Every structure is written in C-alpha cells, then in structure tokens.
C-alpha cells in the first residue's frame, strides 16, 4: 500500500507534471539515461505533483540531520583556523556541482546525479579518512567487523534518519550512494558512475588547493608530469579532467576517463598520500585522532547505556558504530574531553 502524505489538492500543473517530465526526458535525455519514472522505493509512495522522485530524494537528503552535520566534519585538515578550508559539506557540494556538469553534457539525468552526490558521504565518520580507518580498526579488533563509509552512508538513509524510519529513497539513489567508493561494486546507473569518478576528481584537486593554502605544499612541490598534462592551477585541472570525462565517456558509452588523464590523476593521488595525507608532519595529529576514536569506542562498548537509542533493536557493535560515525569532529572532541579530563569542583 502506498504511503500517503498530506498534500494540497492537485491542480492542473500537478496533474500533468509526470506526463510532461516523461515527454521532456524522452526527447532531451540520452537513451542511456535513467528515467525519472518509474523509480521504485522500498515502501511505495504516491508521486508528488511538482517534483520528480529523484528531486524528492534530493530534498529529503538536504533536510536530513546527517547532511547538516557534514559542515562540522573534516575533509583533510582537522579544525583548521582559516575560514576557507573545505569541510565534508563543501566537498559534497563540489562533487555534486561537477557531477551535474558532466551529466548535462552527456544528456543524463541531472536530478539523479544531484541526489546521489548530495547523499554520498552522509555516513562518513568524524576526522576524515583517518577517523574512518581508526573506527574500522576498532570494530575489527573487538567484533571482527569492518567499517566502510559508503556502506554506512546507505545505512544512514535506510535506517538512521527519521528516528529509525529512514528516508525511503529510490533504488537508483541508494545504489549510487552505496557504489560511490572505489572499494564498492560499480553503480548500475551511469549517473551513479559519474559521482563515483567525479568524487575522486574533486577531492584530489581540492585537497591540493587546501594544502597549498595551509602552507603544507608549495606550487613548486607539485609533480611536473601530471601538472603538464592537467594544468598548473586547480581550476585548469578540474576543467581538463571534466572535459576529458565527458569526451571519453561519450566515445565509450560508459563513464570513463582517458588513460593519460587517469594516469595523471593517479600520480597526483600518490603524491598527496606521500606528502600530505600520510606525511610525517601529519602523523602526530593522526595518532591523536586514533587515540580519541579508540577511547570513545572502548568507553561506549563498556557503557552502552550512554548511547542514545538510535535503532533500539541493533546489537552492541552496531549501536556504538552508529553513534561514533554520526559524530561531528567538535562533538567527538567535546565528548572525549568530558570523559577524560577532570572537572573543576564547585567552590563552597
């Protein structure tokens, strides 16, 4: 039975909306595009008269608590002092923006790309990839399980949002969220594959920009060969990579990049791991992050009564993981301090 939500009486625009969208997509989109109708949900719902199913998914994601928390989650630098460093939220918006550009050029479904892009990192834990690795280690050592943020992003939209009801997103959006990571199987739609590839394009280039701003890198440090291929500035590199994806994908009938661009991007990624992500200067901060995550994980395993009832029927490992992965950087630090630092006695 379809879920009915309170709506205004349908007027002539609403009554004709789906018909018009189908006609527009039939004439404007590529035959390889994912159509907006029909779009299956786990729990069937009546269609909206003014939004496509993928637009409704986008709106549910944007209005979710997990989406709002992204503004206080690390992209690369933990709690940077400047106002212009990227967060997990700005990264999400940048991935979505460049993904929509590619989708439009290839005549694919922009609404679907937008929903996947906005939702792809909802399950990322605090402190970026270092926090993810620390949580994964804790979970594996204590329970023999693994943590992968793309799988947890799907759990967020399916179970954790709306007090355990989930957002009831369409199947293509859920598939794209799950498949956005290189460690996951390819998404079934071309739109999902766009987000998967453009996520890497965005974060490598934007992380370089932040590292230059922070003084961790100098322009002269960047490797010459990939810079010669892609461009000297961040804007040039993004432009070159986006054009390459569009032209290569149009020829291939799939979402791909040329061998030359792929090799240049991989070289930049290797450079960033060696000189930024895993550099000696960052190791001390990484150890602090690992200490905080381990301390909180151990504490909540021993004191599960302190975990809010996000999903009451979940087992201990899942409850601890859900709670820690949902924390922002600053909430995680405040919680750690409250549990480990002595408090001043009240004066008498």
Short names for language-model regions:
Residues 115-116:
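Active-site alpha-helix of zinc metalloproteases
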Residues 119, 123-127, 202:
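Short active-site segment of divalent metal-dependent hydrolases/proteases
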Residues 128-141:
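A glycine- and small-aliphatic-rich helix-loop capping segment at beta-alpha/alpha-beta transitions
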Residues 1-88, 92, 96-102, 109-111, ...:
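Histidine-centered, transition-metal-coordinating active-site segments
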């Amino acid at each position: 039975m379809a879920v009915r939500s309170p709506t205004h009486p349908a007027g002539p625009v609403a009554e004709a909306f789906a018909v018009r969208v189908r006609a527009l997509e039939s004439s404007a989109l590529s035959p390889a595009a994912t159509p907006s109708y029909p779009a299956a949900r786990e729990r069937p719902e009546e269609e909206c008269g003014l939004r496509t199913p993928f637009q409704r998914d986008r709106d549910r994601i944007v209005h979710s608590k997990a989406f709002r928390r992204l503004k206080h989650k690390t992209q690369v630098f933990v709690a940077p002092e400047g106002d212009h460093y990227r967060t997990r939220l700005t990264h999400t918006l940048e991935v979505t923006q460049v993904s929509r550009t590619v989708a439009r050029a290839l005549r694919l479904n922009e609404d679907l790309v937008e929903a996947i892009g906005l939702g792809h990192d909802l399950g990322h834990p605090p402190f970026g990839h270092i926090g993810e690795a620390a949580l994964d280690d804790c979970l594996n050592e204590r329970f023999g399980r693994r943590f992968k943020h793309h799988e947890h992003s799907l759990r967020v939209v399916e179970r954790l949002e709306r007090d355990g009801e989930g957002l009831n997103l369409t199947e293509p959006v859920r598939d794209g969220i799950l498949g956005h990571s290189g460690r996951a199987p390819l998404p079934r739609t071309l739109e999902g594959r766009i987000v998967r590839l453009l996520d890497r394009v965005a974060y490598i280039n934007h992380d370089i920009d932040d590292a230059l701003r922070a003084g961790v890198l100098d322009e002269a440090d960047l490797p010459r060969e990939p810079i010669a291929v892609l461009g000297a500035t961040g804007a040039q590199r993004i432009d070159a990579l986006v054009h390459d994806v569009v032209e290569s994908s149009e020829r291939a009938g799939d979402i791909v990049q040329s061998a030359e661009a792929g090799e240049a991007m991989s070289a930049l990624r290797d450079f960033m791991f060696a000189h930024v992500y895993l550099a000696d200067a960052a190791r001390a901060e990484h150890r602090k992050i690992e200490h905080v995550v381990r301390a909180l994980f151990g504490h909540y395993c021993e004191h599960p009564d302190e975990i809010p009832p996000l999903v009451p029927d979940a087992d201990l490992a899942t409850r601890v993981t859900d709670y820690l992965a949902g924390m922002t950087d600053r909430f995680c630090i405040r919680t750690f301090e409250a549990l480990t630092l002595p408090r001043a006695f009240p004066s008498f």
